[in-house]
Amino acid sequence: MLGASEPEDVIKQCTQVLEHIANDNSVPRNIRRSANDILATLKNEAEPLFLRTSSSISILEDISNDPNIPLHTRTLIWNVASQLETIPVDE
């Protein structure tokens, strides 16, 4: 994930990680459902980029506090949120 500077590249990398989380059966269903919701939000090009990323970050922060989430998944979620935070708001 490091080194991605273009917002499209960041979105692409984040969607790959989120797809991995959504397809991981060791992750609780509510977390997988949220990952699918975030994927749908990020892929919805009818909304501005800053709105898609801020909505996604909000959902990621909510699910990262879930006590049932596996540690490896929590780390992935934090990484995705950090990457999404690098996308500039003014575009």
Curated annotation (Swiss-Prot):
It holds the Pfam family UPF0147. Gene3D superfamilies: Ta0600-like. It comes from the Archaea. Signal peptide: none annotated. Belongs to the UPF0147 family. This is UPF0147 protein Mbur_0922. It comes from Methanococcoides burtonii (strain DSM 6242 / NBRC 107633 / OCM 468 / ACE-M). The lineage of its organism: Archaea, Methanobacteriati, Methanobacteriota, Stenosarchaea group, Methanomicrobia.
